[in-house]
Amino acid sequence: MTDCTKEQMVFPFYKQKSLTVNFKGGDLSSDGGLLFVRQLDERWKITEQLAGVLDDRRDQRYINHELLALLRQRIYQVGAGYEDCNDADTLRNDPILKMCCDQSTDASDALASQPTLSRLENTITVRELYRIGELLLEFYFAKHKRAPRKIILDVDSTD
């Protein structure tokens, strides 16, 4: 029988500790795929670019989570299938999500709460949404050598 599985994989983006994944069991997480999303984000700098088009209008005296960390948490949660901000309270201490957001895995160092992420979403202006759209288009065109023959927009307004 052919063994096509690597023994282990290393994810260098997490600077606080060595992060090595193996396939031998032990502590398991249903969100391990986020490690690959984070690795791609590290290469393509998508969340960093998104943070660059948003103005952080929060009072700096009361900030516990940097804008980039909030964006990563929210985007990675959606990428893992947690579409609602209310999932943030359940995921605040998820070790994989914390690593992907460059947060310590210590229990006392939680990710942002649902109200914090909801405030982030509700403070984005129309102008910033437009800039986000432009950025995503630029990113798309940079990754494709030629324009596609057609683009299908699947707009589904149902839940």
Where are the language model's segments positioned?
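Dynamic "connector" segments at or just before major functional cores
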Residues: 1-159
